[in-house]
A protein has these predicted regions:
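Noncatalytic carbohydrate-binding groove/subsite architecture in carbohydrate-active enzymes
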Residues: 62-172
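Active-site groove signature of glycoside hydrolases
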Residues: 27-61, 117-126, 165-172
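Short, solvent-exposed loop/turn and secondary-structure capping segments
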Residues: 4-5, 12-16, 28-32, 57-62, ...
Length: 172
């Protein structure tokens, strides 16, 4: 899994990284990969196009991100038998409007999945220890994790209205 930066990175930069990593055709980029010690291309299955674009990934509106996503994915070339599974940035938690807008603007010809961002730590980012917590924090974390089921159900319902054949996946 590689995630490309659509907030401050360029389409060309993304396209060249994909070629560098996955192509076996002789080119300046594949020659550079060989000089860097990797003769064979990597198998890259999952490609995230943007990350948390509603927040730290660019503070984008869903309509704007959908347009940006479509432009970037146009240049996500498959090299040497490597097929990229293109993942669009999905919503933060219960932002169902984000999913609605993505599904209105994207289809299975240009996206393979939409991801869902949900963090179950009730005091994140202050939570640093995986073992130093009290019972109250434990139960709050379990309650937050239980909310995942509702999120998956509701986002899936939106996706299924636009994609009844379920060609577009939901990635958690």
């Amino acid at each position: 899994y590689i995630n490309v930066n659509v907030g401050s990175g360029s389409v060309r930069e993304m396209s060249e990284w994909i070629e560098y990593m996955t192509s076996d055709v002789e080119s300046p980029l594949t020659e550079q990969r060989k000089k860097n010690g990797r003769a064979e291309p990597w198998k890259l299955e999952y490609l995230g196009v943007g990350n948390e674009n509603w927040g730290c990934g660019g503070n984008m509106r869903p309509e704007y991100y959908a347009d940006v996503y479509k432009r970037y994915q146009t240049f996500c070339h498959n090299y040497s038998g490597n097929r990229l599974y293109r993942i669009a940035c999905g919503s933060s938690s219960a932002d169902y409007n984000w999913t609605e807008v993505m599904m209105k603007n994207l289809d299975s010809n240009n996206v393979d999945a939409i991801d869902l961002h949900y963090y179950t730590m009730p005091v994140w980012p202050e939570m640093e220890s995986a073992t130093d917590f009290d019972d109250e924090l434990y139960y709050k974390t379990i309650a937050a994790a239980n909310f995942s089921d509702e999120l998956i159900t509701r986002h899936s319902e939106i996706m299924n209205r636009y994609d009844p054949e379920k060609k577009i996946g939901l990635v958690i």
